[in-house]
Amino acid sequence: MKRIGNLYEKVCSIENLQLADEKARKGKLRTYGVIEHDKKREVNLLKLRETLLNGTFHTSKYDVFTIYEPKEREIYRLPYFPDRILHHAIMNVLEPIWVSTFTADTYSCIKNRGIHAAAKKVKQALREDPEGTTFCLKLDIRKFYPSINHDVLKSILRRKLKDKRLLCLLDEIIDSADGVPIGNYLSQYFANLYLTYFDHWIKEQKRVKHYFRYADDIVILASDKSYLHSLMGEIRAYLGDLKLEVKGNWQVFPVAARGIDFVGYVFFHTHTRMRKGIKKTFCRRLAKLNKRKRRSEEHTSE
């Protein structure tokens, strides 16, 4: 595989930092970080460029908080300036390079893919190959983001990149928190990269026809239940080499009996339905919106 260099200057260019600033602020124009940054925007970008060029950039302190929907998770948030701008600047340059390494079977946080593309592909497989999709192997990884090993991730980055200064910067960002922190813009790409060679192994060496991955949520379809059980043993070993552990609730089951619970839907050969939890969340949010609307109307009529 050809390794790519001469990227650091592209990341550090003032034009790229300005573009990153424009991207990072989308949907956040009224937030404190953007408002403060805009008071001295040009000076800040020049300062960021200087710290990158002289090698003195260090990741800022994280603001860590917990969310409870759809499940309890710790979220790590960095300041808008300089960190979020820098992460976008890095991805302006690296996104096409990294995405080129992904197989067509992974869907999380990739432009023109996502949940709907994953759902479409699962439906297509079930419709076009009912015999070859009789059984499903469903698995996910225990505490995937916190379990990502820094040394393994760094070695994966070096399979595609050879720019020493850029790799040094990426190493600093990686080492700024345990695992890969949920909430960082770069984290979703690091997570996809961490499993991209596993994807290639599944498709190119194991010759799995029906394989779908969304983050660490994995679905494999086949006609033979015993084959899927055997493959699961190999998957567990491969992921173990990546310092990852499969959750104990993995299952092999007939699709006709219970459907495939994946990306918010439950898929059968003949139909698809929305997951119950998604329906409940939607109904709760709709009820809140209707309640606000009624209050607003009552206030207006007074």
Indicate residue ranges for each PLM-predicted region.
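Active-site catalytic microenvironments for nucleophilic, acid-base chemistry
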Residues: 93-97, 197, 201, 238
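A common structural junction motif
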Residues: 236-244
